[in-house]
């Protein structure tokens, strides 16, 4: 499919040090496309985002994916320093309070990346436990969704997929705790009938594709479901979102 529009989007939306949902998705997509194609333009865009955040002193846990990528690609201390500063602000051990879905997405994948790459895996258990504790506190059994509905459930599902992807499955107990929650939330979202919108569908399908790639779910069962939902997005006029999700699924 035609992804030229995405390269045009990157040219028109240069990093400005102000993190947003749009920046999050652009960086996420660039990291994936760089892994698939090796194209330097995608790597350069992510590193430019990391540089803009460091320069503006605007680093936040949800932009951790850009900083960890830049650190892995360059080894430069400025990215490590920014990551360490954010972790110091958060505190190494997650709060005992129940975290809403948006905070799960912002904070826990960052914490997991830190533990796996810089923190010697010392706090992997509390990170995985926070997902489990927040899930039990937020889960609406009657609706089969996270409290707040489909959007909140999709946010939590993508946070889980990101954290599972970062956690080594050798740490089986903690890895499995997150996988079990992921599967419950995914089933709930797929069972919830509602009109698609690009934000919720994008998070759901990105998390579903990640589950297939990580072998958490059966591709023969779930990829056809994803294809139907992508087609529904395209029919509803969200062609660019459908293109991105098609490219993501086609790489599996």
What are these language model-derived features?
Residues 155-194:
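Oxyanion-binding "anion nests"
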Residues 30, 53, 90, 134-135, ...:
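Buried hydrophobic core positions in alpha-solenoid tandem helical repeats
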Residues 120-161:
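Loop-centered beta-sheet repeat module
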């Amino acid at each position: 499919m035609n992804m030229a529009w995405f390269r045009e989007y990157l040219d028109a939306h240069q990093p400005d040090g102000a993190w947003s949902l749009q920046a999050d998705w652009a960086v996420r997509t660039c990291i994936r496309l760089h892994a698939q194609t090796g194209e330097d333009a995608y790597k350069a865009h992510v590193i430019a985002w990391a540089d803009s955040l460091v320069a503006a002193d605007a680093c936040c846990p949800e932009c951790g994916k850009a900083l960890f990528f830049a650190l892995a690609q360059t080894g430069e201390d400025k990215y490590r320093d920014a990551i360490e500063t954010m972790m110091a602000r958060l505190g190494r051990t997650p709060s005992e309070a129940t975290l809403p879905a948006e905070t799960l997405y912002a904070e826990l994948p960052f914490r997991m990346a830190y533990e796996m790459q810089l923190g010697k895996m010392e706090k992997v258990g509390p990170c995985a436990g926070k997902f489990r504790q927040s899930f039990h506190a937020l889960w609406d059994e009657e609706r089969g969704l996270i409290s707040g509905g489909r959007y909140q459930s999709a946010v939590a599902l993508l946070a889980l997929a990101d954290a599972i992807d970062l956690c080594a499955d050798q740490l089986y107990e903690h890895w499995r705790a997150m996988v079990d929650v992921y599967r419950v939330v995914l089933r709930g979202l797929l069972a919830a009938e509602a009109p698609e919108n690009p934000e919720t569908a994008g998070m759901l399908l990105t998390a579903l594709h990640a589950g297939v790639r990580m072998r958490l779910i059966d591709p023969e069962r779930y990829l056809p479901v994803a294809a139907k939902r992508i087609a529904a997005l395209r029919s509803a006029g969200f062609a660019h979102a459908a293109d991105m999700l098609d490219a993501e699924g086609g790489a599996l």
